[in-house]
């Protein structure tokens, strides 16, 4: 037991932490070098070294998570290159949610927070937009959101 604690409390979850790290911290304009990756994993209770991380990156690639290595001078930076949604697509969805009259302000904020989780923390700030539509009042009825879903289910 003591040996496992020395190695790190979350070693078995290393690939999950790596995938989360790349999803939350990297994008086309933001990458991490090996030292940053090792430090961020250590903060999560995961010990790692360069050699095993290279193998882990390949495991992620084999699973379909596109990790790119980019040379920056003497350093190599790593980043996630492909996501389920592109940033412009998410901006469109955010604008649609904000402008939808039948979605409450609270539910709009919840949905937008979920959409923000699909991009890096850097790109998430670009999704914090405010769509202004004159004379558009958002509903106060929280059940409308679920009623629309129920109607759709009934139609199908």
Identify what each model region corresponds to.
Residues 86-156:
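Bulky hydrophobic/aromatic content
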Residues 1-96:
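Short, basic/aromatic recognition patches that contact phosphate-bearing ligands
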């Amino acid at each position: 037991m003591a040996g496992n604690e020395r190695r790190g409390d979350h070693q078995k979850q290393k690939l999950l932490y790596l995938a989360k790290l790349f999803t939350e911290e990297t994008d086309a304009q933001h990458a991490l070098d090996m030292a940053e990756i090792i430090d961020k994993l250590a903060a999560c209770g995961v010990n790692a070294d360069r050699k095993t991380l290279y193998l882990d990156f390949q495991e992620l690639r084999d699973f379909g998570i596109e990790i790119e290595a980019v040379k920056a001078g003497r350093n190599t930076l790593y980043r996630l290159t492909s996501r389920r949604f592109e940033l412009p697509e998410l901006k469109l969805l955010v604008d649609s949610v904000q402008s939808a009259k039948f979605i409450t302000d609270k539910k709009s904020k919840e949905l937008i927070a979920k959409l923000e989780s699909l991009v890096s923390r850097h790109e998430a700030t670009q999704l914090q937009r405010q769509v202004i539509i004159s004379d558009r009042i958002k509903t106060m009825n929280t059940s409308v959101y679920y009623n629309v879903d129920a109607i759709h289910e009934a139609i199908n």
